Amino acid sequence: MNNAALDARLLAVASLVRRGARFADVGTDHAYLPLYLLDTGVIASAVAADIAEGPLASARANVLAAGRERDVTLVLANGLSGMDDLGLTDIAICGMGGELIVDILMAAPFVKNADIRLLLQPMSRAEVLRAYLASEGFAVTAERYAIAAGRAYLCLAVAYTGVPYEVDPVCAVLGDRALRSEGDNVAYAAYLDAREREALCRLRGKKSGGLATDAEDALLFAIKKEREVLA
């Protein structure tokens, strides 16, 4: 397997996996991520899990084709169910909405462990995910942004501290500048564009309904300021 099998979104996730990690990929689909990490020597073994037999069958076929059946354990599971005793250190949950990722984390209390790194790639509602992480004492330690198939994506590296904190509604959407890589500036600009379109759509809807638009106004102002920093 080579880099071509991973798009920029999954490469961003892969960049945050620690060398030698006991790794799990939740919602693995084709098992591309664990196979890439094995082939590049980042990890020695992996768990690849999915809730549906179809995607898991695709993963199994790819694992067999790569000759990695001894290195990848395939698991039919709902989220992280049954994985609390596997000694996992790095867990990727990718390609799902932020609310579903929250549900998976809530159902797996064992992830509240300072030795576990979570790699979370929400497809939507990142602000819901960030708010949950803050309320439960999970600190975001790094943010990566990538563009794949014309869409901008966010990936978060997260560690448990046990110390809850407040997250500003704007920061919940746009993230923390200090945690971003300068190499992601182009992708982050595209991410800002997408969030701006969403905010403008909500703003128009609220205005037509005679509702307050304070939240949208604040977000649009913050997006403008972020663009000035990127310029």
Stretches with model-predicted labels:
Residues 88-95:
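Short SAM/SAH-binding signature in class I
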Residues 1-20, 35, 57-86:
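S-adenosyl-L-methionine
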Residues 52-54:
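Conserved SAM/SAH-binding beta-strand->alpha-helix loop
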Residues 20-29:
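Conserved class I S-adenosyl-L-methionine
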Residues 2-6, 82, 99-231:
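Class I S-adenosyl-L-methionine
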Residues 45-50:
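Conserved SAM-binding motif I beta-strand of class I
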Residues 30-43:
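Conserved SAM-binding loop of SAM-dependent methyltransferases across substrates and taxa
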